[in-house]
């Protein structure tokens, strides 16, 4: 009230009224600007003006019990006068200093856990090494890069559910945590953050950094993995670069790198199998990368690479609409074309059937080490502007563009026959034939292309057929630029289809990707890749194939044994025996197979000749298409360790060694597993023990279905009959006893009855 009286008093004086009306501040617009709305219009001025006051801060009353009235220097820390319009206390900035020095200390145990990404960044920088600074023109191209090292790969929605569950577990709202990674992270974080006093909002922000991939479209020359991007401002300017080696790796970069390697291996392997698409899917579903299922990573990881995109397409996921040719990503930026089949003659008079694109089109081409802009018409290159790291990279881009243009002079530059094949020994399509041909040697192509005088354009220079730069002349339509071409920024994903030969097409039928586009580069994965599929056994060489094949038979022996006696053909056709065939000398594969199949048939016919170990040992040889011959073998050859090694038909060898006492099988000296059943105990032991509670009725009776293994007998109901396969590969009919009392006598009768049933 005092203040208001004072103001009224002031207003009654004519001088006050004059000052307020005559000075320019009465401009209504200005007064409105600074007084309307809650948004501060000049924060820095407001801050300076506030801080110049004695008590610019307000705080809850209880702070007066925690802070003394005066500090050590005798300066007042808070005012006894209440803040006008609220029941808070007015406080001096000196109080903040006092609090920072003398206030209570909370537990810091949660800080490294919450601010994990920051702590890890500091460690990486501490251990990173910065090299010399070089001054040179930087060819930067904008790429979509990951700016947030050390994150998991959850989608925004998945992360939101995890954060809500961790930070606000009691809030209402449906949250369904479904994926493996969501559940693991939630459990881990809840444990880490027990009794955490950091504000929930801050915790939520920091969790988001840890869980979600954040990407930006940034100009980059050099490394694009997130540990390089976080120091982009330190490593490259407009005309300089600083060498840098990160002081640590992060899992997200490792996942991206390992995913690419796994996908390339899988696509290459699938391409040579009988049904590439089915094989690819089987391998993707049975592979783990760093302990996470590959299919889960593919669903979440936005990496764009040819092999990765083929795997995604096979799983029915959307991929980028750009297409790949010669290792470059092409994105059409304008124009359109229609396809028409045309027959053309090469310089060697070989006929090629080309799918010619008719119409004017412009493309950006982005590769690992070079980029370009390409303008073309029907079978004519109009202009190509290339930029690249070095001469080799520029050559690669020019060759790809010239082939892509489908110009006649390119086709006429072919010398010799085109007969390139893919990994499965199938002829490549004509465009890839041409590409391979000129990638091997582009000399004739460049010589035949033709040259033209050029105008002097800033930042552009000509290039001659021998790859020397020139300011006067250049290959027709081709220029080299200092500036890179940005990657296509649009991250839209489109629905695609894939055929059984792994060719990926968009909805208009244009081929975006095919196995020919998958890089042959071999790398060493950062995370462990576990391929459970038998198709990938050969990735670690012949020894691995040998060991894995025998391990698989031993692991699945119960079912293998039944198939061996009931349905051998189905067993021989199992894909698990496919890799083994590459170890058997081609010329003799058929004879081995015929010999082993005949031997097995005798075992089935002549009772008592069933020999578990021999069946396991010879089974993989029976998988090849058999040739009928009267040849007998005492040993079979496999090609491992660079030479032929022998497996003895009867008895042990270094390749296949079974120890009867320990029941362990070693293959090439490495453990291949233990046989759970005992192959040598005659009819009595195991079977009679297991057949307790069953009555043996006689020989096999097909009406009661296929033979069960001894392990499957437990599922029978009392009084139910079934055929059962006993250790010797013989099948008998049994019935589960209706009463338990007579079980003891069963094991004695079983032995006699088995003998009778067999004989």
UniProtKB/Swiss-Prot annotation:
Compartment list: Virion; Host nucleus; Host mitochondrion
Function: Plays an essential role in transcription initiation and cap-stealing mechanism, in which cellular capped pre-mRNAs are used to generate primers for viral transcription. Recognizes and binds the 7-methylguanosine-containing cap of the target pre-RNA which is subsequently cleaved after 10-13 nucleotides by the viral protein PA. Plays a role in the initiation of the viral genome replication and modulates the activity of the ribonucleoprotein (RNP) complex.
Site, Mammalian adaptation: residue positions: 627
Cellular compartments per GO CC: host cell mitochondrion; host cell nucleus; virion component
Gene Ontology BP, a term: symbiont-mediated suppression of host mRNA transcription via inhibition of RNA polymerase II activity
Transmembrane segments: none
Protein name (database record): Polymerase basic protein 2
Motif interval(s): Nuclear localization signal: 736-739
Any Pfam family matching the protein: Flu_PB2_4th
Protein family per UniProt: Belongs to the influenza viruses PB2 family.
GO molecular function annotations of the record: RNA binding; RNA-directed RNA polymerase activity
Recorded name of the encoding gene: PB2
Quaternary structure, from the entry: Influenza RNA polymerase is composed of three subunits: PB1, PB2 and PA. Interacts (via N-terminus) with PB1 (via C-terminus). Interacts with nucleoprotein NP (via N-terminus). Interacts (via N-terminus) with host MAVS (via N-terminus); this interaction inhibits host innate immune response.
